[in-house]
Amino acid sequence: MLFAHNDDMAIGAIQAIEEAGLKPGQDIVIISIDGVRGAFEAMKAGKLNVTVECNPLLGPQLMRLAQDVVAKKPVEKRITVEEGVFPAEVAAKELPNRKY
């Protein structure tokens, strides 16, 4: 098993695994973090097994929160963003929904 701390690292590892004559996603199970479009494309191709989403769309919410704090406006105590764990089996269905 190979665990990559981000999808770009996993995609690089996939290239290295292929160059070594192995089949990524089959000979070596690959798990990564981020949930970016490239990871879903790799899963759809059978080269990546799972990606755990780290949603970057939280950034704009946090920026608004910071602006509200500076402006001394009331703010929520907790801000959440939806994230998920995506196995390769759902990659083709989820790929069109990727915003990043």
What name fits each language-model region?
Residues 35-44, 89-97:
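Flexible loop/hinge segments that line or gate small-molecule binding clefts
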Residues 1-41:
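Hydrophobic alpha-helical
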Residues 24, 50, 75-76:
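Residue-level detector of short coil/turn "hinge" positions at structural boundaries
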Residues 42-56:
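Short beta-strand elements at the ligand-binding edges of bilobed clamshell
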Residues 54-100:
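Hinge/cleft segment of the Venus flytrap/periplasmic-binding protein
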